[in-house]
Amino acid sequence: PPKPPSPMFATYSPKTQDLLQRLNAFFDQHIYPNEARHHAELDALRRAGDVWQPMALIDELKVKARAAGLWNMFLPHAYKGQGGISNLDYAPLCEVMGRVSWSGEVFNCSAPDTGNMETLERYGTDAQKEQWLEPLLDGRIRSAFLMTEPAVASSDATNIQCSIVRDGDDYVINGTKWWSSGAGDPRCALYIVMGKTDPDG
């Protein structure tokens, strides 16, 4: 079995060892050899003034990652045959993906989508899962996470000022967000907004 990427844990489950072996092989075959191409594609997008446009390389490698069974590895609960590993098991996979900053998207394991998908999988209604989770898991859309606000230190969620008030069958959201991860991506179709439904809480 492959050696763990760090001494953080003494042993990994057989499933994680298998995923680690296949992930390292994928990096050797497809990620490391394409770092120069990724840099060139990103540079071209920068020169064109739109770094958020999808990259041909990433789209090509997504197909290969899915075929290799290295897709949606982050899900802590199995959902329709995907994911089903613990955070402990996912940690060494993150270490490998962290070696190349852009690789997470290749495996549909990049923020903010991962956290948003976990939220939908755990708390979403069946209708929300069908409308948003399924396309996210399939990699057809991207999502954004709106937490940071200009007037408060909102990395501490208790400081958030954005209010969410029930109005009949609707909710009224009132607030200002910025630095909204993922919002610039043209494939972004879902925004998860952090706000307070209880202004005193």
Language-model features: locations:
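Amphipathic, small/basic residue-rich leader segments at the start of a protein or domain
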Residues: 3-110, 127-142
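Short Pro/Gly-enriched beta-strand edge/turn motifs at strand-loop
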Residues: 142-149, 176
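Active-site-adjacent elements of ketosynthase-type condensing enzymes
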Residues: 151-160
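A structural signal for short hydrophobic beta-strand segments in well-ordered beta-sheet cores
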Residues: 162-165
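A short core secondary-structure module
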Residues: 170, 174-201
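Short loop segments at secondary-structure junctions
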Residues: 97, 123-125, 167-169, 196-200
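Adenylate-forming
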Residues: 116-120, 146, 189-193
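N-terminal glycine-rich flavin-associated loop
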Residues: 107-127, 156
